Amino acid sequence: MNTQILILATSAFFYVRADKICLGHHAVSNGTKVDTLTEKGIEVVNATETVEQTNIPKICSKGKQTVDLGQCGLLGTVIGPPQCDQFLEFSANLIVERREGNDICYPGKFDNEETLRKILRKSGGIKKENMGFTYTGVRTNGETSACRRSRSSFYAEMKWLLSSTDNGTFPQMTKSYKNTKKVPALIIWGIHHSGSTTEQTRLYGSGNKLITVWSSKYQQSFVPNPGPRPQMNGQSGRIDFHWLMLDPNDTVTFSFNGAFIAPDRASFLRGKSLGIQSDAQLDNNCEGECYHIGGTIISNLPFQNINSRAIGKCPRYVKQKSLMLATGMKNVPEAPAHKQLTHHMRKKRGLFGAIAGFIENGWEGLIDGWYGYKHQNAQGEGTAADYKSTQSAINQITGKLNRLIEKTNQQFELIDNEFNEIEKQIGNVINWTRDSIIEVWSYNAEFLVAVENQHTIDLTDSEMNKLYEKVRRQLRENAEEDGNGCFEIFHQCDNDCMASIRNNTYDHKKYRKEAIQNRIQIDAVKLSSGYKDIILWFSFGASCFLFLAIAMGLVFICIKNGNMRCTICI
């Protein structure tokens, strides 16, 4: 039998690794989530809190001229009950009212009390001037057991005018005071409502009583209303205190025939101050500019969630407990399976029309900058940060928190001023209006932070895109984008070559000839990734068919020549 030996030759295929440079951005394993205008919970590399929640439970008074009123109520400083004797005149830029403080001794109330309290809180203290009133035919030493010093007395800054004798006639009187100062004068007087008609007659004589007060801007008449009332401090009578701010060179006139509590001294405000109501302890070892009932807020943040009634140089109160401001790029932690040179990429439009960042996975090892390169060549692999693009992004983000504070201050100061004008006309802003303002502030805060976050993410994405385009323009036809943030270079590119790409000094003409030759060789056999599997299977099938055909041909020739016999047994 003739024997033929068939030798099958096999071809060996090998892969030559191409030089490659990839672009990426910094990432961390655990970023911070922020909200933008279009999306909530976006993770960024860096973010800072804009809402202060830390309170110091003390009144920080270092560097302040502080007056602690203790048992004296603020309004008491202008009428002079016994508990306020030491505060009839004072200077301060921080006035602290305590819960135990009381404005009065003989029971009564102030007209437009909160507005007067607000004026006094801002007063900077009080100084007094005698109004020069003298009286004949009446007693000026009315006193009460409700206002005790060593014995029965009265308000230090007021005169309780009585008939010269019990049940005696009270004469009609007119008294005037001209403000000769260059600042407004605070004038306070009282109307006495006796506990009964009998008491009123005993104190001021019989007949109807009428008190009239006028100036160039004010005119009002008062009629006392005697009658029984619940006893307070042992008294069933009441004193209603009224007041006005008398302009310079203006004159106030009082006309009365009884039941009149006359002012003795006019009050003048010394300057400016902050007045707070708090039982927190004074602390002269810390400084503060923002105060509330629970203590001091010390913060450089634009917003706070501690107290809506804080006063001074304060962050604006918002309902949100946290509003994170992005100060870094969008973070996509590097997955273990993707800690290679290649990275998935995506492109989309940002809110403001710029191309948003397209590199999906960051590099956690890129710690020297926000953007950078990785490369591989015959000399190995390397990583380098791009400082120019990093600094460009940082420069645009630096000061973002301060700019946010400026925006909120400008916006909210306008709102404050508008409502201050309303308060002068109609009194205090009612609570529902205050709540509405807080709603507006809270919405504005959330909106402004979301806008800034959107801008930051678009900005940092744009810097990534600029860096990518810079590399693409340098390499031109000497490399090909692989769609994964990398460029496959068609020539040998050593470390100096890679450095020239990073430094924007790459000379594509120098490598053009080599790159074109290698591109032609690669393109001749390059398969599109979409059809690679199909062609490989087709090639395998065709090879098997060809091998089978050759084998059958050899068998047929051998049978024909008698070198092989086929016997079929049934």
Curated annotation (Swiss-Prot):
Chief location bin: virion
Extracellular face of the membrane: 19-533
Protein name: Hemagglutinin
Provenance organism: Influenza A virus (strain A/Equine/Prague/1/1956 H7N7)
Disulfide bonds: 22-486, 60-286, 72-84, 105-147, 290-314, 493-497
Glycan attachment positions: 30, 46, 167, 249, 431, 503
Gene: HA
UniProt miscellaneous comment: Major glycoprotein, comprises over 80% of the envelope proteins present in virus particle. The extent of infection into host organism is determined by HA. Influenza viruses bud from the apical surface of polarized epithelial cells (e.g. bronchial epithelial cells) into lumen of lungs and are therefore usually pneumotropic. The reason is that HA is cleaved by tryptase clara which is restricted to lungs. However, HAs of H5 and H7 pantropic avian viruses subtypes can be cleaved by furin and subtilisin-type enzymes, allowing the virus to grow in other organs than lungs.
SUPFAM superfamilies: Influenza hemagglutinin (stalk) (SSF58064), Viral protein domain (SSF49818)
Membrane topology field: Single-pass type I membrane protein
Keyword Cell inner membrane: no
Compartment(s) where it occurs, according to its Swiss-Prot or TrEMBL record: Virion membrane; Host apical cell membrane
Site feature: Cleavage: 349-350
GO MF term set: host cell surface receptor binding
Cellular component per GO, a single term: viral envelope
